[in-house]
Amino acid sequence: MATARPRGRDLELRVARSADDRAAHFLVRHTVFVDEQQIFHDTDRDVWDESAVHVVAAMGPLVVGAVRLYRLDEAGLWQGDRLAVLPDARRTLRAGAPLVRFAVATAGELGGHTMIANIQQRNVPFFQHLGWRRVGLLAPYHGLTHQRMAIGLSAAPSAFADDGYAWALGS
């Protein structure tokens, strides 16, 4: 799995490659989803963390962003979620967009056809700017209004047509 450095920045994007990377990944998520946004009470970890690909954005030794992705089926449907960027990195590094692009590219490299995500309503324009499309209606998810969104991945063709993903795409 490759690493990437967005032009003009010292931000490194990579799949978590060590126990320290994974610990930092979980710490960023905890800081954002438990401490800052209070979406979860004690932890945001769940069963998907066992098989997920954990991605980090780092400035030198400091991990400032995290996202996880995981395969939902053998035909190439992937889920991206738990995108978290520390507040200072949101403003000064604008780490969110490179982190999302890296996650999408990684799922594509792993044979993905389509990635879906539940996006907080306030972040929908950001994801649309990155090429994601709305799927279905707004709905509550972990106590906040979210929009299901999807993006095509550049890798393997789907073993099923998009209508085979009706359950995931809200159609």
Locate predicted features.
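Conserved beta-strand in the GNAT
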Residues: 56, 61-71, 77-84
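Conserved catalytic-core motifs of GNAT/GCN5-like acyltransferases
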Residues: 118, 133-150
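Short acidic/glycine-enriched loop/turn segments that link adjacent beta-strands
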Residues: 49-51, 74-76, 141-146
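Short amphipathic alpha-helix that is part of the acyltransferase structural core
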Residues: 1-54, 58-62, 158-165, 170-171
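Short, well-ordered beta-strand micro-motif
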Residues: 56-58, 148-152
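Conserved GNAT acetyl-CoA-binding A-motif
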Residues: 106-120
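Conserved acetyl-CoA-binding loop-helix of GNAT-fold acetyltransferases
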Residues: 85, 91-105
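Conserved short alpha-helix immediately C-terminal to the canonical SAM/SAH-binding motif I
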Residues: 99, 123-126
